[in-house]
Amino acid sequence: MKNLPVRDSKPDQEPAANQNAEHDLKARLLSGDAETIDAIILAGSVEIRAKDLHAIIRERELVEKKFQAISMGYHELRHQIREIMRTLEAAALVNATDPLPRCLAEGTFAAQYLLKEDDLMPDSVPGVGLADDAILVKSVVARHGRKLARNGWDF
């Protein structure tokens, strides 16, 4: 995700190559291309540290507000991000330290991504703005299964 197109000096226009690259990335993500989704998750979570986990927990009210804003069509997203947040909260309670287990790093990335309004697909786009968020969260849950929904962690 760090290699997303950068805007040139004209703020309202992107070079055609950058527009095409971003469009291609969105299309592959929304089509469910597992390789693309995994690459985004790995790139986004590789530098996640315990301080990031603790920071996202401090932002839980923003996450809760986002839950309330999530439309009915995204019931599964709401459930999955709540499970991730519960796991992250449990990890924070026992003062999880670096290096974080992969499931916690990716769970933290998923929560951070959900909070971003302007990610690959801006959340403000009616009906589809949360599609990329839902795909990434679902993929993180699928990658780690019960590790993201169990209690009594020993970090």
PLM features: what roles do these ranges have?
Residues 1-108, 138, 142-155:
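Terminal, membrane-proximal amphipathic helices
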Residues 101-136:
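Membrane-inserting effector segments that mediate pore formation, membrane fusion
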